Each structure stands twice: as structure tokens, then as C-alpha cells.
């Protein structure tokens, strides 16, 4: 009996570890409001300076300096797994600063979630229009890869052409080649 309980506890712990929702590198210090509203922070950044926050979106520019790298991120709201909601509207932009070199190939045009400390705002431009960017010092980053899930139709009720036709024949359900839906999703 003890062996069964031990196996059950071990398997449940593996199951729970596999289902952990937010990657460790962007988990943060477990404060309840770490996933802040970007709009609220952007409107009054002075209230949030020094606080840890998690934001996500699409990296649209990578600026390498002598000692650090800035990621310009077009911000999207995050879901409960800290993934950017790719079907939502963009909320604004932020600059995420990381000491050292980050290769633009690994980040530009990718969806990311960052964890960092809010530093305030930094004036800049989007094209030639003045814009105040929220500035964040990065402590962690998760790059998400876009995967398209293709759902095809599976017809359970139509059994083919008849007994004298080759497969699928009678009694064999068949797949149609029609694509009914393509759903984009983000994965690690």
C-alpha cells in the first residue's frame, strides 16, 4: 500500500510540475499584481518606478549599444499563462533594457514576455512622431514561437461511396481535405 501511495504522490508531483503555467524565468517575486496593466503604467509611470512588472508583445526593433541592448516592444495584453494575446489590439510601446549583447536575429519580429523593473519613461520617436516610451530593466525574457494549428474536418457519418469502391468503402469513416480552421497559438 505504501508503494502505491508513493507512486501516486510521485506521479502527481510530475503532473503538477508539467502543468506549471508561467515559465520560471518570467515568474517574478510572486507579488500578486506583477502582471500590471500597461495602459495604467504608461499613463502614470512615476507611480510604478522601482516595481517589478511583466509585459509582453512583439519585438519590433533591437538597438544594440556599447554596453546594453534595447528591445522596442509593441505591447499586447497577457493571458493567464503570461503569453501575449495575439488577437488583441496593441496597447503602446516600451523599451526593455538588457545589459550585454542580444542578437537581433533571435528577437526581432518574435513575440516575447519580459520580467523587469520599471524605470520610468524615456522620450523618443515612432517614425517622426514624438512618443514617451515606458522603460523597463529586464530581469528575464521568454521568447514565444508562433505555431499554426490546422483543424481538418472528420466526417463520422458519411461512410464513403459503397461496397464496390476502393477505400474508404462502406463502414470506414474518412477525412476530407477541407481545412475548416487555422488557429495561431504561441508555444515555448
UniProtKB/Swiss-Prot annotation:
Localization: Cell outer membrane
Role, per record: The induction of Slp may help to stabilize the outer membrane during carbon starvation and stationary phase.
Lineage, uppermost ranks: Bacteria, Pseudomonadati, Pseudomonadota, Gammaproteobacteria, Enterobacterales
Presence of the UniProt keyword Membrane in the record: yes
Membrane topology qualifier: Lipid-anchor
PANTHER family assigned: OUTER MEMBRANE PROTEIN SLP
Lipid-acceptor residues (N-palmitoyl cysteine): 19
Assembly information from the UniProt record: Forms homooligomers.
Leader peptide range in chain numbering: 1-18
Gene Ontology annotations for the cellular component aspect, listed alphabetically: cell outer membrane; outer membrane
Organism whose genome encodes this protein: Escherichia coli (strain K12)
Keywords (A to Z) from UniProt: Cell outer membrane, Lipoprotein, Membrane, Palmitate, Signal
Keyword Lipoprotein found: yes
Protein name: Outer membrane protein Slp
Residues linked to a lipid group, S-diacylglycerol cysteine type: 19
Record's note on what induces expression: Induced upon starvation and slowed growth. cAMP/CRP-independent.
InterPro entries (UniProt xref): OMP_Slp
GO molecular function: identical protein binding
